[in-house]
């Protein structure tokens, strides 16, 4: 658990590893998936709270946002703490002294701002022993809380605990590692480290030469990265082990993964390690395979057992690697992951293999099989980051599901030696996720109990019925936003399903969805939804982008339609928080009920706003000509051919020039020209056409999210893209 103030020691500890890594060729590129990918990187933005773990963002039951991070340094006077931050989102959160400085009222030694007693008396701490003859380690165990989850049944906070214990076990400069889990029943003020979760396959006793008879030992399992998967109902934990030269330092780093049903709440015995292609080994003491990318040298995604670490093998690390008895550092070491809804894939960002390097991204479509493919890297943007995490840039509170553009955070040893920063990363694809629905149809949204979502008659409220009645208020139309999220409009009223996105009330468990017109500039983040497939049933969860909560329906009083945390089990605790909610309440089927109102617009049309038609001035055939509006005259330069795309957007080509309506330069800026250009299929030539309340349509650029807008009702008014103001100059009739 090296920190910014401990870098000199860290550098010495890792020197042998870096020297060995420098002599190892970089891994071969992964076999290309069916799609091709592009990775764009924005300008770095400082992150002002870097420390010795990644930040772990989460939302409490009342909608309050938190993130948590820790440090546990080795010297007698060095800091050891579990810190908590709170605020509107990641950008505004500040350290909560009420939680971070809390002291256990039953034990004055048990503190969040000094975890020395807690770590030494935890399940791992009581098994640990102090270093002998090594003054650098003042304690027998150092523990970091990292990886948070809030129990939907009780509201209790859970977290995984990384232990570094029994330091210098063979007279070296390292230690053993293990992962425990902890629970807080008072919103983080006091904690109980309950038990082991994931531990080494090998002995962690000091000087155990029977287990480690030769030149090396394994320091065990640590540096966990938790992912709570809404699709499968499992926790997945990516973690690492290191192979240490006795009397020296670590010289190799291996990657592993374990999983447990979320319903088991991190308990000992619920975890299974990935070993030899199966979830077959217990989390505590079980064997584990080293993970590698699927590429020309591996089709399985893991190191064969015969080539993985075995303490019975003699020789140094480099000798074992040369003999094929040990893999080199895994390219997937301590990988944090997220679900990218635009790609329809899980993506991961591991630690660099050979020091400072571009950040690599890997992807898989199935966490059950753990086959990760390299899809690209950040090019000129490089770092040697110790700690990384994802965040959806639209909500700035959630790391579980992200859109096409997301934040990639770095803490410690970032680009140019920065201690902390993030960049906006955009992963483009030649084959993004296919829409799970036909956007030309309307759908009935029903849960596993058969209840049907409806807009309440004459109201902005939503409700659910025990069975469908055939009312149009029970039908919903999905429109892709172009970034992996969708807006969901009631087929009868055209209003969008959502939750308030301006306060924590919209994130609170049980928040009731309502319908409303789109916000200024388009759907608010509370009116955006991710459609996440449920792998076990073939159904879906609708995850609200603002809150991270999922849509559920119930016959219980007061919760006919609500948003709650993902669950794959039925609450049996008796707690009012869980309220006996079941998985069936939020596992949804989407059944077509007919065509979406207005139907598809494929074919030739005119477009008019404020009585003036969209016009290709002077019958131009020149790419780059800015479009205008003009008195309708029936000319071919005022005819536009709509071609529907697979995501529901339209390519709009002039009937005379055959050139496409195009946001000039793919600009995201308000006021950018809308021109005609050779049709390329780019997102800046795709337009989302949506019925507007009060009549007409909005025509929104898929690339920028801004609306097709004419400057005035005068002939020759120039057409640009602008934020949605509700103006008649942005409301188009389609003839």
For each predicted feature, which ranges?
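Secretory targeting and sorting signals
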Residues: 1-31
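Beta-rich carbohydrate-recognition and catalytic domains
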Residues: 32-141, 150-157, 161-212, 230-233, ...
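Beta-propeller and closely related beta-sheet repeat lectin domains
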Residues: 53-56, 142-149, 222-226, 333-336, ...
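Conserved hydrophobic/aromatic positions in well-ordered beta-strands
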Residues: 180-182, 258, 338, 360-365, ...
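Short coil/turn segments at the loop-to-beta-strand junctions that recur within blades
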Residues: 200-203, 379-385, 634-635, 681-682, ...
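Short aromatic loop motif centered on NTY/YTY
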Residues: 208-216, 221-225, 385-406
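Short, surface-exposed tryptophan/glycine-enriched loops
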Residues: 226-228, 393-400, 532-537, 690-691
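Lectin-like carbohydrate-binding module/patch detector with strong preference for beta-trefoil
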Residues: 433-735
């Amino acid at each position: 658990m090296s920190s910014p103030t401990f870098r000199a020691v860290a550098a010495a500890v890792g020197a042998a590893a870096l020297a060995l890594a420098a002599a190892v060729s970089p891994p071969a590129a992964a076999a290309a998936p069916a799609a091709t990918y592009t990775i764009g990187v924005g300008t770095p933005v400082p992150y002002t709270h870097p420390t010795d773990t990644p930040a772990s963002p989460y939302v409490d039951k009342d909608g309050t946002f938190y993130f948590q991070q820790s440090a546990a340094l080795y010297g007698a006077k060095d800091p050891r703490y579990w810190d908590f931050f709170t605020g509107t989102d990641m950008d505004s959160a500040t350290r909560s002294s009420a939680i971070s400085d809390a002291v256990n009222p039953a034990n004055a030694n048990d503190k969040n701002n000094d975890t020395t007693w807690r770590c030494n008396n935890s399940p791992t701490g009581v098994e640990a022993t102090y270093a002998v003859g090594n003054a650098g380690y003042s304690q027998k165990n150092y523990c970091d809380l990292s990886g948070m989850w809030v129990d939907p049944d009780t509201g209790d906070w859970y977290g995984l605990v990384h232990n570094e214990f029994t330091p210098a076990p063979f007279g070296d400069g390292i230690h053993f590692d293990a992962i425990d889990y902890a629970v807080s029943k008072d919103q983080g003020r006091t904690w109980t480290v309950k038990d082991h979760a994931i531990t080494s396959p090998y002995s962690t006793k000091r000087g155990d030469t029977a287990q480690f008879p030769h030149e090396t030992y394994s320091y065990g399992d640590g540096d966990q990265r938790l992912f709570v998967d809404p699709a499968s109902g499992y926790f997945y934990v990516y973690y690492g082990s290191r192979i240490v030269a006795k009397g020296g330092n670590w010289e190799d780093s291996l990657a592993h993964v374990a999983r447990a049903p979320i319903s088991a709440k991190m308990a000992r015995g619920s975890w299974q390690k990935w070993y030899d292609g199966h979830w077959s080994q217990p989390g505590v003491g079980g064997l584990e395979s080293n993970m590698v990318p699927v590429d020309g040298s591996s089709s399985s995604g893991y190191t064969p057992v015969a080539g993985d670490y075995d303490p019975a093998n003699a020789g140094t690390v480099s000798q074992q690697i040369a003999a094929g008895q040990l893999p080199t550092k895994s390219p997937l070491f301590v990988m944090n992951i997220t679900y990218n809804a635009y790609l329809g894939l899980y993506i991961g960002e591991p630690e660099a293999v050979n020091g400072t390097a571009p950040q690599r991204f890997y992807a898989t479509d199935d966490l059950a099989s753990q086959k990760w493919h390299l899809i690209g890297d950040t090019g000129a943007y490089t770092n040697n980051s110790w700690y990384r995490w994802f965040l959806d840039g639209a909500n700035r509170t959630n790391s579980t599901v992200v859109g096409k553009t997301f934040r990639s955070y770095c803490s410690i040893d970032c680009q140019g030696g920065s201690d902390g920063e993030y960049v906006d990363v955009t992963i483009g694809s030649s084959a993004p996720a296919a829409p799970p629905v036909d956007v030309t149809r309307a759908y009935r949204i029903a849960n596993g109990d058969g209840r049907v979502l409806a807009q309440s008659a004459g109201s902005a409220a939503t409700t659910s019925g025990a069975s469908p009645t055939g009312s149009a208020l029970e039908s919903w139309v999905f429109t892709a936003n172009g970034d992996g999220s969708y807006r969901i409009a009631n087929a009868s009223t055209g209003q969008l399903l959502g939750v308030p996105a301006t306060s924590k009330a919209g994130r609170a468990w049980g928040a009731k969805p309502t319908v409303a017109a789109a916000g200024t500039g388009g759907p608010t983040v509370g009116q955006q939804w991710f459609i996440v497939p449920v792998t076990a049933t073939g159904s879906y969860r609708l995850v609200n982008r603002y809150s991270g909560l999922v849509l559920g329906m119930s016959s219980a009083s007061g919760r006919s339609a609500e948003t709650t945390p993902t669950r794959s089990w039925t609450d049996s605790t008796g707690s009012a928080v869980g309220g006996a909610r079941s998985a069936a309440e939020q596992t949804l089927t989407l059944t077509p009920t007919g065509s979406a109102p207005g139907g598809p617009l494929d074919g030739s049309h005119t477009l008019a706003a404020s009585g003036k038609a969209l016009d290709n001035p002077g019958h131009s055939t020149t790419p780059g000509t800015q479009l205008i509006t003009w008195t309708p005259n029936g000319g071919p330069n005022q005819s536009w051919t709509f071609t529907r795309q697979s995501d529901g957007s339209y390519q709009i080509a002039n009937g005379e020039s055959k050139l496409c309506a195009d946001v000039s330069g793919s600009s995201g800026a308000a006021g950018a020209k809308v021109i005609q250009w050779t049709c390329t299929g780019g997102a800046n030539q795709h337009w989302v056409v949506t019925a507007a309340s009060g009549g007409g349509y909005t025509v929104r650029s898929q690339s920028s999210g801004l609306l097709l807008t004419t400057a005035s009702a005068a002939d020759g008014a120039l057409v640009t893209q602008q934020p949605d103001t509700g103006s008649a100059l942005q409301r188009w009739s389609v003839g």
